[in-house]
Amino acid sequence: MLTPKRRGLADTVGFAHRREQIEAVVERISAQDGARLSDIRKAKGIAADDRWRLAIAPHDDYAYAGFMYPLALRQIAAPTLVIFGVAHRARDLELEDRLIFDSFTHWTGPYGDIAVSSLREDIVARLPEASFCISDEMHAIEHSVEAKLPFLQHFNRAIEIVPILVPYMSYARMRELAQPLARAIALTMRERNLGWGDDIAMIASTDAVHYGDEGWGGRNFALYGADRAGYAKALAHEHRILRDCFEGELAPDRIERFTRYTVADHDHREYKWTWCGRYSVPLGLLTAWHLQQLMDAPRLSGTVLGYTTSIEDQRIDVSDLHGMGVTAPATLRHWVGYAAVAFR
């Protein structure tokens, strides 16, 4: 038997990495926000047996993002998950314009190893060579996929994953990459007789706006000002993005609209509005849209499940959980938004 090639952990402070940690976090979210989660699901018309084919979910500290994780991920029932992650440090490794896969056999989970699905090799084998690269280094230092795994494994011990990081690229390049990726996934699904939503699902990772004029490496992300009035205006801007891009039927023009909201017109490497998933989200959505066509599947319809920020709600207390805590401040001068979106 081959020796497993395990990916380690990038963040043991913001996220759970032990069984007792994730179980305590889930219990505390249920105690603090369980009624709220139930009310949201009822208001959004979500039945207990509804299954997401695609979800957008955050990757920030559990203390801050808290209930957004189960809100976005609880209805993911498929055991095989294609996860589109952010490549936060792609510039450091000079990576852009290609999908980034890994070669690990397993990722570390709180209940034991999480296998990388053999679908990865089938998918990669069907992609144009210039469309992807393999970088274990990039995957090892990136936290956006890792953040979701403790919750996903808590809900389903049998999960397998296909992690794909999405670095800098223009919307035109996203369109070039999404179609062959969707085709590769569709062919693999047909070969293995996999149902979308039941056997395989997709997750796109992003935190929403990174806002404020303090603690952002000398940059000022406070477009509307770093006070209560600015906070209210920033929230209105966020809800406009969610409404314009994700609520209702998924369509390419709405996906492109998201990039126009978030990516600078003069340089796709720069922010217009600071969602770190400005590449992972549209690439994931475009792939899903093409997959819908190729599989002759029902049209994907988005539901904005919820939105909050690192300063909006009561934190989940993790201070007693074996070194867990927060990795950044949360003030009017430095805060992050979180969105949960489901596509059925």
Label each PLM-derived region with a short phrase:
Residues 185, 290-292, 297-344:
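Long, Lys/Arg- and hydrophobic-enriched amphipathic alpha-helices
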Residues 1-286, 290, 294-295, 307-315:
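Active-site histidine-anchored catalytic micro-motif
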